[in-house]
């Protein structure tokens, strides 16, 4: 958790909340030590200057590093749904469970943000959040319908 706090220091989410709240929530949803650790760290490589090698040098276990390698989305190289398909195809249960937890939490907070945007008549935010929520709902269905060791 200390690594995640360091990596996300000063970052804000779309609603202006501390960005660390999301990885903390995802980590707390984990059912194993690896899922908890990977949940806490799942956005570190995407959203900070830390690399997988940095995390390994800080003592993060190989099982967690393997999950994080799958969970770190290189948006310039791989489309979102291909990224989700790659997580599923890997069969890495830790990565799959963390992605499920990530999606559940993103949808939960996305719906709250959407309702706030509707209440304030923020048309641009309504449109953007609608797009993001639809993407997350589709990804969630992809994983729920996938055949993997649960």
Label every model-predicted segment.
Residues 1-150:
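Active-site helical microenvironments for divalent-metal-assisted chemistry
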